[in-house]
């Protein structure tokens, strides 16, 4: 399953990228990540890896994520190595003094989590709603004077 969502924020691309690419900020705008802990010596950029706990439906699923692609001020892509099977991330494009941020995610649900078509529908809606909510939270954070006006 996959989806893509975009939003435009009134924040320079470098500040938007810096905020999103700092693992310590992910829980502030990704509502379906309950916990995240670095497990690699490198904690920023290529080579960084994190143990996370995703909330999917009613289940908490431990998942290890690796930074697969890191292009400063352009793209951050994460891929799971175990747990929930996911690949996704953010693309950043400057638009005037603001930034267009696109979040995309491809995922496969673990066996046993989906028993009926209704389960699948509810989980897909949960992921979609979480992505939309996350982008709105991210917009709110990035447009706050604390982030936007930081030198």
Where are the regions that the model predicts?
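Hydrophobic beta-strand positions in extracellular immunoglobulin-like domains
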Residues: 9, 54, 105-107
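Hydrophobic ligand-binding cavity/cleft-lining segments
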Residues: 1-40, 45
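Beta-strand/loop substructures that line and gate deep hydrophobic ligand-binding cavities in soluble
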Residues: 80-133, 149-151
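Residue-level detector of alpha-helix boundaries and kinks
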Residues: 1, 11, 52, 77, ...
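Hydrophobic pocket/interface hotspot
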Residues: 16-20, 26, 50, 67, ...
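Glycine-rich portal/gate segments that line the openings of hydrophobic small-molecule binding cavities
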Residues: 37-87, 97-100, 133-151
């Amino acid at each position: 399953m996959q989806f893509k969502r975009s939003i435009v924020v009134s924040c320079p691309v470098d500040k938007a990228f810096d905020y999103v690419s700092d693992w310590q900020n992910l829980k502030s705008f990704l509502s379906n990540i309950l916990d995240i802990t670095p497990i690699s010596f490198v904690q920023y950029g290529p080579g960084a890896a994190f143990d996370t706990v995703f909330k999917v439906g009613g289940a908490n699923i431990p998942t290890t994520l690796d930074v697969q692609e890191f292009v400063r001020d352009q793209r951050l892509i994460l891929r799971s190595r175990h747990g929930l099977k996911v690949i996704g991330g953010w693309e950043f494009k400057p638009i005037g003094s603001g930034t267009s941020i696109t979040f995309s995610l491809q995922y496969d649900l673990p066996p046993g989590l989906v028993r009926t078509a209704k389960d699948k529908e509810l989980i897909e809606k949960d992921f979609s709603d979480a992505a939309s909510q996350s982008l709105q939270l991210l917009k709110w954070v990035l447009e706050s004077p604390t982030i936007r006006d930081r030198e």
